[in-house]
Amino acid sequence: MSDYLVKGMAGEFIRFTGVSSRQTVEEARKRHNLSRLATAALGRALTATIILASDLKNPGDLLTLRIFGDGPLGGIVCSAGNDGMVRGYLFNPEVELPLNDANKLDVGRGIGKGHLYVTKDLGLKEPYTGTVQLVSGEIAEDVAYYLYYSEQRPNVFNLGVLVNPDGSVAQAGGCLIEILPGAPEEIISTLEQNLGEQQSLTYQLQQGKHIEEIIQEVVNPYKTEIYVKKPVGFLCSCSREKLLPHLIGLYSEVKDEEIVEAVCHFCREKYTFSGKEIKEYKEKNT
């Protein structure tokens, strides 16, 4: 099944967004040649970015998630619009660490201490950026903390990436469950109890459950109503035309017959330009 996103309500006071993202994360892994640890970290961030960007209202709006830590992975940058397409990269994609005490990939140690930034470009004069300190570096907790303290949105945020021994992605997904203002205390208690009884997100996906089924179990006995379902994936907006302006600084350094190679940070796509092409562009546009 292709990757997809669902959004909906459960009763009057629970709003949810869920994403199944295995193919998206696998595409990122292959493009960036990620280690197992880096796959888990970037995969969680890509999934979180899809979820956060799904609340954008207009086609041209853009959300960028940046995570900068002092751990060996360095940092992560991801961006997405409300169309479900995401792109992203990680500073040090080859880093690997020993498993943590729970025998899992140690994303928290890989990211370390630092800050999380969410920037929303809504076509206004200036983009809006909110920031919080990292809580754990595990990404889900950090995004949940951001939503609660920067946007006053009480929530449960769950992200998971299961990586095979050969490095390929077995499962990936995430869900955001929000408690709306005015919710009775018993709703919160019910969610807490249900969450405490659940297996991990990736375990349930590996057992064949769909993300909407997992969400239904979390919000039970409140019945879910899905009002959005759409495909998601890894897609970069880079092009030769967009990269060429960044090369005009080489104007005086390259000869006409020289070939310059440019690589997109977000997707590792390679583009080649001749010195003559760079010079002609500069002369026409400066």
Curated annotation (Swiss-Prot):
Disulfide bonds join 236-238, 264-267. Keywords: Chaperone, Cytoplasm, Disulfide bond, Redox-active center, Zinc. Belongs to the HSP33 family. Gene3D superfamilies: Hsp33 domain, HSP33 redox switch-like. It is found in: Cytoplasm. It holds the Pfam family HSP33. Its main location: cytoplasm. This is 33 kDa chaperonin. Under oxidizing conditions two disulfide bonds are formed involving the reactive cysteines. Under reducing conditions zinc is bound to the reactive cysteines and the protein is inactive. HAMAP family: HslO. InterPro entries: Heat_shock_Hsp33, Heat_shock_Hsp33_C, Heat_shock_Hsp33_N. It comes from Carboxydothermus hydrogenoformans (strain ATCC BAA-161 / DSM 6008 / Z-2901).
